[in-house]
């Protein structure tokens, strides 16, 4: 059971690194910045933080 948790944590970390790498590649393209009143820039980090909190609460 303990090794399964460790494998799941490793898989989650790899997925987070992969998603952040994809986000950095997408950020290098020319695109207009969101307006200051838009919450679009905060959506992705908030999503990752929520998923990480739920996963750690579920595992531990």
Curated annotation (Swiss-Prot):
It is a lipid-anchor; GPI-anchor. The modification Pyrrolidone carboxylic acid is found at residue 28. Residues 39-60 form a propeptide. InterPro entries: AGP3/12/13/14/21. A lipid is attached at residue 38 (GPI-anchor amidated serine). GO terms for cellular component: plasma membrane; side of membrane. Contains 4-hydroxyproline; hydroxylated on Pro-32, Pro-34 and Pro-36. The modification 4-hydroxyproline is found at residues 32, 34, 36. Glycans are attached at residues 32, 34, 36. It is found in: Cell membrane. Residues 1-27 form the signal peptide. Expressed in reproductive tissues. Expressed in chalaza, funiculus, stigma, septum, style and transmitting tract. Keywords: Cell membrane, Glycoprotein, GPI-anchor, Hydroxylation, Lipoprotein, Membrane, Proteoglycan, Pyrrolidone carboxylic acid, Signal. Belongs to the AG-peptide AGP family. Proteoglycan that seems to be implicated in diverse developmental roles such as differentiation, cell-cell recognition, embryogenesis and programmed cell death. This is Arabinogalactan protein 12. It comes from Arabidopsis thaliana.
């Amino acid at each position: 059971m303990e090794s399964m948790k460790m494998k799941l944590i490793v898989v989650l970390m790899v997925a987070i690194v992969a998603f952040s790498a994809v986000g950095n590649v997408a950020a290098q393209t020319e695109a207009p910045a969101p307006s200051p009143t838009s919450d679009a820039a905060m959506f992705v980090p908030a999503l990752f933080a929520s998923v990480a909190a739920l996963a750690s609460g579920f595992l531990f």
